[in-house]
Amino acid sequence: MSTAAGSRKKHSKLHNEERADITKDEFEAIREALSKEEFRKLFFDYVEEVQDPENRKIYEQEITQLEKERGVDIKFVHPKPGFVVKTSIDGELKCFINIASSPEVARPNSEVGMNPETGGRGLSWSIPMAQTGGRDDCDAKNNHCKVFDVVFHPDALHLSTRDSQFRKALIDTALDAVEREYEVALDRANLKYPKLDYKGIARPTVIRKLAANPTPEEQEPHPLEHMYPTKPPASNSEPKILPMKTKAAPVPEFAVPKYSIKQSHDVDLSEYTDELDAKLHVTVPRSLVVEIELPLLRSTAECQLDVTAKSVYLLSERLGAKYRLKLDLPFVVDDKAGNARFDTEKRRLSITLPVVRKSVNQQRQMHDTLRYLSREDSGVELHSNSESPVEDDADGDMPETPELETAAPPDPPALTPSTFLKDSVHYQLPKFDCNALDNAMAFVLDVAHVQPDSIVTLKTDRSVSVKFATIGSGYYPTHYAFYMELPSVDMEEYHKDHCIESIEAEAWDNNVIMKLFLGAESKAPTSYLAGLHANGLKEYQVYGHYKAKTDKNNECEPNPPRVVQIMRTDDAVVITVRPPHTSITTEEDDEQQQQLHKKPSKKQRKRNKKQRSYSESACEEMLDQQDGPLGRKKDATTPMVPQRKQRSYSECNDSTIGSENVNRGILKRFSRYGPRPSMSDSCSSIDDCGFSSHSCSVDASSSLFSQSFNGIPEEDRTEEGLSESCKKTVRFNDQIMKQVFRHDSSILGQRKKNQKRRNCKLRAQQRRLSEGDSADYEETRDTALKQQGEPSGNKLHDSGLDLTGASASHRTDNNSKSYRTRQDHADADAKNDAMMFEMDDEDDEI
């Protein structure tokens, strides 16, 4: 797109539109001088003297002599009239080219040559020429125009009158010279040859060359060198030779006129509001204004104009004014409502075409779509009180609102798996996860801020498709799609029972949950196929199956009868639970029963409070007992040592024990993993539920994984019913040890300091003892030091389970000996503790 104003500025120098640099005083002086009769007479005499041919000849001789003194030979070229070519510059300014002659220009010559394309013989011409500077002039209507002179030898003009091809070559040479020298574009499609020999007044030009043999005086610099024209360089002594043209320049049949497209827009105050749809049509103009420059036409009666919704076509076949223009419009226009106007003074055609905008219904639909895209994802529909501006009709009257019809809208076309996803929309596969529960499957699609209205589902007997969209911070929608298909099985009954009955899809803040419900008699499959669409599916496994809880599952199976023994001591109550077949007691059991009647020491009380766990030997026995009946028959000959688990309860349940001064536990709930036993509301802690329907003891022989064992949830089972927690035990000490290191001291220095502190404390305790107590303390201290040297005595703790197995019979004697050793150590500890308690009591009394 270009404008006429820009092209006029481009040729301002050619038009000589520069204003004269004259002051106001100078202008007044010239005006006063011209008002005098004497000055006017002298001025006219000067003009006549300059235009006199004799005086001009004398002037040329003087100039030639002056230039010769500077070492420059000059020749005055006086162009003689020939013929005139009329055209235009850049399709705007009228231009005349004078084809003149002068004997001062060299003769044209020719050489025999070969045509490189056809191979035919011909003549290759060399045509010398001379050019004058362009000058401004006026045409017959006193309009501004431009005039150029191109001078050839008289023989060249004589040949042009006899040979039409030579004449055409002469004209092309003159046009090329003007375009190359003045950097303009001439209209070669509309050349005219007026009946003129010469346009304007002939003005001579000068050919300047350096002298061939200058004298020493001529080579000396002239005192007025700065006032004369610059000497021509020595390289220009020879005429400039242009490359020979082997192919004629193509001459277009029609010229393309200059044009411009302007977008016209009215000022609408509704576009300056804060509505979301206020500036929807800011970039859409009300109309398009197309301006076409036609300087060679007097009216539009000689041209054809066709306007369509997207283009403009102009054609002029008049001789000397051939124009053709095919223009594509940037907007759809109403060709029936346009108008055209031709300016005869400026030779300009203006076409005004209104732009077709969308209808009111389409604009309202676009407004609703924009509101939907810009809605905040807060879970609550936002309704704005302000409505979008309503477009008025052409007559300006508001249309009457017709009565609403009760006709139901047409049903949308049925979706199929092939047409469910649009080809023009790019879909992404979201991250997903699957959970199964009986005959239901739940898919969690990890996509946040999903628009609930954008969720569309498609269900078949064996597959489900879902698509939805989410809006980002830039109001740009992102589309997602998910396709799930059940695995194919050849059985007809399987297909009949395992079919998808219904689906539910719900959008949350951070994801989308889709639920699939299969037949009532079917179960969730172990695998499924998923992907973006039906092509390129991938198989996924369902890792977790969960069964819904029923009343039958909640009912506890009756435990086999067990033998329960309750022994009450001074400080605690010991409950022993044994299976009915473990009635045989061993020597170790008798010793343990005797030990229970004794007063427990401080360490024993702490040990009894610790929670016991399974050992590896007990787990091995569970695996053996979990074998089939053949395993039981095979191990029937092996003597089975009765298995037990003892737990000491404080008297916390009045309904079972009926004692006073109870210490209740702080554990208020069971483990989060595994099944929970049913407890009555009257139990305030786990200790209150000791005699509930779920026993607190663990019987490995009858119930390998009873409901009272709340451990780590099992993941991979090597045997059915056996948890991996049986093979891993963790014991925690009640005493918390803390070691603090100072940053400005070494560890060894702190160790010595702590050892010194302990020695001081020990000496202080010795000073408090009497003579008899000191002796007992020394004996007790020696015994304690010996026990520290034997780590096998104090570091072994009873886990509360009788370790039985294949090697249990071989270690019966060793166990009895180690038990006696531990009993001796326990007696010594009890004695030391009693002595320390007595010392504390004496200190309190003091």
From Swiss-Prot:
Swiss-Prot/TrEMBL GO biological process terms: axonemal dynein complex assembly; cilium-dependent cell motility
Acidic residues: bias regions: 389-403
Pfam families cross-referenced by the UniProt entry: PIH1, PIH1_CS
Intracellular or extracellular location(s): Cytoplasm
Residue ranges of the region described as Disordered: 1-21, 372-416, 581-657, 743-846
InterPro entries reported in the protein's UniProt record: Kintoun, PIH1/Kintoun_subfamily, PIH1_N, PIH1D1/2/3_CS-like
Keywords recorded for this protein, A-Z: Cytoplasm, Phosphoprotein
Biased segments, Basic and acidic residues type: 821-832
GO cellular component terms listed in the entry, alphabetical order: cytoplasm
Mitochondrion listed as a keyword: no
Molecular function terms from GO: protein phosphatase 1 binding
Domain of life of the organism encoding this protein: Eukaryota
Chief location category: cytoplasm
Modified-residue entries (Phosphoserine), positions: 378, 770
Residue spans of biased composition, Basic residues class: 596-612, 750-766
Function: Required for cytoplasmic pre-assembly of axonemal dyneins, thereby playing a central role in motility in cilia and flagella. Involved in pre-assembly of dynein arm complexes in the cytoplasm before intraflagellar transport loads them for the ciliary compartment.
Quaternary structure and interacting proteins, as annotated: Interacts with Pp1alpha-96A, Pp1-87B, Pp1-13C and flw.
Family membership: Belongs to the PIH1 family. Kintoun subfamily.
Protein name from the UniProt record: Protein kintoun
Classification of source organism: Eukaryota, Metazoa, Ecdysozoa, Arthropoda, Hexapoda
